A protein has these predicted regions:
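Post-DEXD/H (motif II) to motif III coupling segment of the RecA-like Helicase ATP-binding lobe
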Residues: 140-151, 156-198
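P-loop NTPase motor module signature
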Residues: 1, 33, 102, 107-110, ...
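Conserved helicase motor
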Residues: 77-80, 101-112, 129-131, 154
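Conserved helix-turn-beta segment of the N-terminal RecA-like "Helicase ATP-binding" lobe
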Residues: 88-104, 140
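Low-complexity, highly charged intrinsically disordered N-terminal segments
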Residues: 5-91
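Structural recognition of the conserved hydrophobic beta-strand(s) that form the central parallel beta-sheet
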Residues: 75, 124-127, 150, 195-197
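Conserved motor-coupling elements within RecA-like helicase/translocase cores
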Residues: 110-126
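Conserved catalytic network of the ASCE P-loop NTPase/AAA+ motor domain
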Residues: 64-68, 93-95, 116-119, 140-144, ...
Length: 198
C-alpha cells in the first residue's frame, strides 16, 4: 500500500525523470480511529496516552533513553509555531530526566539545535521534517530507541492547508519517513516503529 507519492521531479528541482518516490508503510500505520476527542493541540497528550502506552516494550511517555538525542516518540508537524504549541501541550510528559525537545528551525539555528540534541535526554521530540532530517544526518538525533512517529495530519493552517497539503513539507516528510533506518523497522516485531496520524 502506498500512503503517499511525490514525483521525483518535485524534489530534484526539475529532474528529467518522472519517477515516483513511494513509501510502503501499511504495516506500520496504527489505526487511531478509536480516538473520540477532537484532534486539537490540547488533545495530543491524551492521544499519545491512548495509543502509545499499551505494549510492554514501550517506554512510558515520561521516560527517556539513557543516551542523549534518542527519543522514543517523534511528533512531526508542518511549521515551527505549530511545533512550539505541541511542545507546550506535551510538557506534562517532561521530567528532570526526560525532556520534550523542540526540533524545529523557527528561531533556533541548526548549530544550536545540534548542540542541544547532543546534550539532551529526550523522551519526545517535536519538529518539522527538514530539521529532524538535519539532526539525523548530523548524528545528534538517533532513532535506535524510536518507537513511534506521530504525523500532525489534522492541523489546518491559516491558508487552509494540512501537513500533507503543503508542497514545501510533503517532500521532506516523505523523505524522512522513507529513510532506510526507519523504513526497515516499520511494522516489524521487536524494535518496530509505528506511524500514527493525529
Amino acid at each position: 500500500m502506498c500512503i503517499y507519492q511525490v514525483r521525483k521531479d518535485d524534489w530534484e528541482n526539475g529532474g528529467e525523470r518522472g519517477t515516483e518516490l513511494t513509501l510502503d508503510t501499511a504495516k506500520a500505520i496504527l489505526d487511531t480511529t478509536a480516538f473520540e476527542k477532537p484532534r486539537t493541540t490540547e488533545a495530543l497528550p491524551d492521544f499519545l496516552e491512548q495509543f502509545a502506552g499499551t505494549a510492554k516494550r514501550k517506554k512510558k511517555l515520561s521516560q527517556s533513553a539513557a543516551e542523549t538525542g534518542s527519543p522514543h516518540t517523534l511528533v512531526i508537524t508542518g511549521a515551527g509555531l505549530r511545533a512550539a504549541d505541541l511542545t507546550r501541550a506535551l510538557r506534562k510528559f517532561e521530567t528532570k530526566d526526560s525532556k520534550v525537545a523542540k526540533l524545529f528551525a523557527k528561531h533556533i539555528k541548526l548549530k544550536e539545535a545540534i548542540e542541544a540534541a547532543k546534550k539532551t535526554k529526550m523522551g519526545i521530540g517535536v519538529g518539522t521534517p527538514q530539521r529532524v532530517m538535519d539532526l539525523l544526518e548530523d548524528g545528534a538525533l538517533k532513532v535506535k530507541g524510536l518507537e513511534r512517529i506521530v504525523v500532525d495530519a489534522s492541523h489546518i493552517d491559516q491558508k487552509k492547508r494540512g501537513v500533507l497539503d503543503m508542497k514545501e513539507i510533503q517532500v521532506p516528510l516523505v523523505q524522512l519517513l522513507g529513510r532506510e533506518e526507519l523504513r526497515k523497522r516499520y511494522g516489524k516485531g521487536e524494535g518496530k516503529v509505528e506511524l500514527l496520524f493525529f
